[in-house]
Amino acid sequence: MTRSDTLPDLPTVAEFVPGYEVSSWFGIGAPRNTPTQVVDKLNAEINAGLAAPKLKAHLTDLGETPLMGSPTDFGKLIVEETEKWGRVIRAANIKPERLIRGLR
């Protein structure tokens, strides 16, 4: 884990707790079978938007690190995160609970 560009003097949790690794990320998906040319166009426009200085600065001010990539990159991230957190959940024997009243 690397230090935040916004607060470079603030140590990461991993500097105090060896092996600590948690991050959050956001992504945009499209329905299955969306034509490749549509996905590629959306990806190019989203990457261009994230690279725009004004938006990039705003996201950075919010403590976010805008990352651009391809649909393949994002798919790999989803698989890696699912596998990693699946192992954690199984090792800790975490079971789902009904958290929201009325949700079944």
Describe every region a protein language model picked out.
Residues 1-104:
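Conserved, function-defining micro-sites of small-solute handling proteins
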